[in-house]
């Protein structure tokens, strides 16, 4: 037996013997070399289609929600030719029940409803629109984010919660859009990124990731991503049906039926889905 083999065996024996004593720890995946514990990876969840509904392929979806049984959508307009809209839609048929067109200088973005009042963000115009449920404009309110952009919008029942495509969530006082706090989102210890359309579901914030097929489930108490939902199979199905369909974007939750819906920009379908392990 060579000297090298003997040395290896002796070293292995000594290491094994030393680990019988307190203070000897394995350097596993939960710890870095400096002994600090790494944050856990988010749980991976699947997304199963329960039902499919028609969706207007001209809708560049930026905001999606269900309020008192009604489906509402905010659309953007990359060409700024007057296609940014606020819509109320019949879920089963996909037909528009009510429509408001934004001035073509605005790019429609995130959408939420709080206490019968509709709030709609704009992309780079730093303006939020406030409406009644029948789409009568109440006022325009300036708002601010770190990069000056508005992307997703939701509410926890007290505050309006927005993002700007970065890793940050912004909490606003609803009547004034005064910034209350900023919450950084972290994914396995690293800053999250590309946060887009938002939805608040049973105490968690769900966020699409722009240009990715994931939805992030975020704990609002600390900004930690606790789970990731993979929509790759749904996106592939949509692309096969319509190659012009854009990225995944749009999460809606019906608190009465407990049903979740997802769609994307210019998608031909909107899906009722279920998240599971």
Could you tell me what each predicted segment is?
Residues 20-23:
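C-terminal motif of bacterial Sec signal peptides marking the signal peptidase cleavage site
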Residues 50-55, 97-104, 143-144, 182-191, ...:
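Surface-exposed loop and turn segments in beta-propeller and other repeat-based domains
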Residues 90-94, 132-136, 173-177, 219-223, ...:
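Short loop/turn segments that connect beta-strands within beta-propeller blades
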Residues 93-123, 127-129, 137-147:
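Blade-loop segments of beta-propeller domains
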């Amino acid at each position: 037996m060579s000297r090298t083999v003997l040395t290896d065996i002796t070293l292995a024996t000594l290491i094994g013997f030393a680990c019988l004593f307190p203070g000897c720890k394995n350097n596993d995946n939960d710890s870095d070399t400096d002994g600090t514990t790494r944050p856990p990876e988010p749980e991976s969840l699947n997304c199963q289609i329960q039902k499919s509904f028609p969706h207007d392929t001209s809708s560049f979806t930026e905001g999606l929600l269900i309020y008192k049984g009604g489906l509402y959508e905010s659309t953007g307009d990359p060409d700024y030719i007057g296609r940014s809209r606020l819509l109320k839609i019949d879920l089963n048929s996909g037909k528009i029940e009510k429509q408001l067109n934004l001035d073509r200088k605005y790019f429609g973005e995130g959408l939420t409803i709080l206490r019968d009042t509709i709030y709609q963000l704009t992309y780079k115009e730093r303006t939020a629109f406030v409406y009644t449920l029948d789409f009568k404009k109440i006022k325009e309110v300036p708002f601010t984010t770190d990069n000056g952009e508005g992307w997703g919008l939701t509410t926890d029942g007290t505050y309006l919660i927005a993002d700007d495509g970065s890793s940050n969530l912004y909490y606003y006082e609803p009547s004034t859009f005064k910034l209350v706090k900023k919450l950084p989102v972290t994914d396995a210890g690293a800053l999250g990124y590309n946060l887009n359309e938002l939805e608040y579901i049973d105490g968690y914030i769900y966020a699409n990731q722009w240009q990715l097929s994931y939805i992030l489930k975020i704990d609002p108490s600390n900004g930690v991503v606790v789970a990731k939902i993979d929509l790759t199979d749904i996106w592939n199905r949509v692309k096969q049906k319509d190659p012009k369909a854009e990225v995944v974007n749009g999460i809606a939750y019906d608190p009465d039926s407990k049903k979740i819906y997802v769609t994307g920009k210019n998608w031909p379908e909107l899906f009722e889905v279920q998240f599971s392990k």
